[in-house]
């Protein structure tokens, strides 16, 4: 699933609701996916091409980064100098975190080196090039997305506009989402909250 895609489909929501897709289900699951991202502070899709992002170390040995799903293509540059991949220890090991498999890497620990770090002034930016995201969207995240989508669908607000195009009246309908508290949709839904809370993280020091 590419970055920016919904974690479930409109047809998945149709099955959950046991009703046909009314034409807005794809928009609803997209909004629900963004709600889950805001609540967890994570992006569960993945990129297939490595891209550079910048981060700051939190101490001499640990660099929290955005989630990345493979060490293939991993490059670390400090002050313009490339480090060897063996200079860092990506964690969690074996994709296991809190006893659960399937996790990406999100911490880089140094091996016989230290990150540029100071408690005085601004810390140096460290450039990490990686394939960001998760190998696969976790099932609890898919279900949390459907929980939120179900709530959105129940309280849906639709704008209807009509305009003349070449002498023909054309009516358009659009889903109104700008007034929604997206992150609040997760915390306000007990099922979604319980499914998503294990994936909440502190924000890394990244600059996309």
Give residue ranges: language-model regions.
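Divalent metal-cofactor coordination and adjacent catalytic microenvironments
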Residues: 1-208
């Amino acid at each position: 699933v590419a970055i920016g895609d919904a974690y479930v489909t409109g047809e998945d929501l149709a099955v959950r609701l046991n009703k046909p897709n009314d034409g807005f289900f794809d928009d609803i699951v997209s909004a629900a996916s963004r709600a889950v991202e805001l609540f967890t502070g994570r992006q569960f899709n993945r990129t297939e091409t490595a891209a550079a992002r910048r981060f700051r170390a939190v101490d001499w040995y640990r660099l929290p980064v955005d989630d990345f799903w493979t060490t293939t293509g991993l490059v670390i540059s400090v002050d313009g100098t490339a480090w060897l991949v063996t200079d860092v220890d990506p964690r969690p090991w074996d994709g296991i975190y809190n006893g659960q498999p399937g996790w990406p890497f999100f911490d880089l620990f140094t091996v016989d080196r230290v990150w540029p770090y100071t408690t005085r002034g601004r810390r140096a930016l460290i450039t990490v090039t990686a394939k960001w995201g998760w190998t696969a969207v976790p099932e609890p995240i898919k279900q949390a997305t459907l929980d939120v989508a179900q709530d959105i669908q129940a309280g849906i607000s639709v704008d209807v506009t009509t305009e003349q195009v070449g002498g023909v009246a054309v009516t358009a309908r659009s889903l109104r989402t700008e007034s929604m508290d997206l992150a609040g949709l997760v915390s306000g839904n007990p099922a979604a909250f319980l499914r998503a809370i294990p994936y909440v993280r502190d924000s890394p020091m990244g600059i996309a």
